[in-house]
Amino acid sequence: MTNIRKTHPLMKIVNNAFIDLPAPSNISSWWNFGSLLGVCLILQILTGLFLAMHYTSDTMTAFSSVTHICRDVNYGWIIRYMHANGASMFFICLFMHVGRGLYYGSYTFLETWNIGVVLLFTVMATAFVGYVLPWGQMSFWGATVITNLLSAIPYIGTNLVEWIWGGFSVDKATLTRFFAFHFILPFIIAALAMVHLLFLHETGSNNPTGIPSDADKIPFHPYYTIKDILGILLLVLFLMLLVLFAPDLLGDPDNYTPANPLNTPPHIKPEWYFLFAYAILRSIPNKLGGVLALVSSILILILMPLLHTSKQRSMMFRPFSQCLFWILVADLLTLTWIGGQPVEYPFIIIGQLASVLYFFIILVLMPITSTIENNLLKW
């Protein structure tokens, strides 16, 4: 009798994706982040579901309902902090996953890469609308500032902002629709992740060398299932350390003050995972220019396959490109730091230099360096 996992219509799909999937024998721990993102998404959906049972999306009661969850609901505090810090873990895994793709040339899988960029945008949108829900000072002013950026779009900008707000300012209508968006988007993310995997399994995984690995494949189970479980255990350990010992480490103290439209906080800033983009936005003194730079900073990922001029796929054997890659990482860390600083000297000029360097490395230096390395191969 044939094994049920190979014949049953549903089990067959699971089997081909997670059990009998032929995987390269040499993929490193940098390939763990895909499964970790899946775990993060499931964790966020589950904790979010339980939070939604007790949350009310009304300006009068939203802040109180979050307080009620933390104080009165059984284990509400741990669910709330797992959800808040789970978002941070999600973004850490996302940035590592994208960084891995850039370093090892995984962007040559065009469909997989482009769906991935769409996923990144969707997760960022979800995190943004989610941050508004507790209705603290930073929630309210973050929502006001970021949605206001759309008014920079010529002709339709103002109408667009008022349409999103559902009125002439961030108010009850805004909070209610943001809750609706925050509830539906994770399921859209889950669907997109399925498509992401579908396209990946059309080609098979990349590997650190960037060389086709068809001649040397091993089954996903047990080799990579056990490896993924180790990654998941480490992720959960790190998340629970955050949740149980420093739950507010990555949050903003201003968000423990209820939203007040009449009182602007001295420094409006988003969560840490948006600070690099926020720094790029602030480094341009023109509103529309800033918005374009902000969008371009993420959208530039779509251009990566076009900017790939090297004869080698991976950076594994390209020391000059490796140096540039790590300079880019350092630049992004600098931008993240600048995004959380006040708008004054010397932070303004550092932010502007870091923003220019970010685009210059990706658009100019990387393709030139790859071409130089191609010529060095002839020596």
UniProtKB/Swiss-Prot annotation:
Cofactor(s) the protein needs? heme b
Q: What is its main location?
A: mitochondrion
A GO molecular function annotation here is: ubiquinol-cytochrome-c reductase activity
Q: Does the keyword Membrane apply?
A: yes
* Residues that hold heme b b562 according to the record: H83, H182
The answer to keyword Iron applying to this record is yes
Q: How does it sit in the membrane?
A: Multi-pass membrane protein
Q: Cofactor note from UniProt?
A: Binds 2 heme b groups non-covalently.
GO BP terms: namely: mitochondrial electron transport, ubiquinol to cytochrome c
| A Pfam family it matches | Cytochrom_B_C
Binding of heme b b566, residues: H97, H196
Other remarks on this protein: Heme 1 (or BL or b562) is low-potential and absorbs at about 562 nm, and heme 2 (or BH or b566) is high-potential and absorbs at about 566 nm.
Its family remark reads: Belongs to the cytochrome b family.
* Protein's name according to its UniProt entry: Cytochrome b
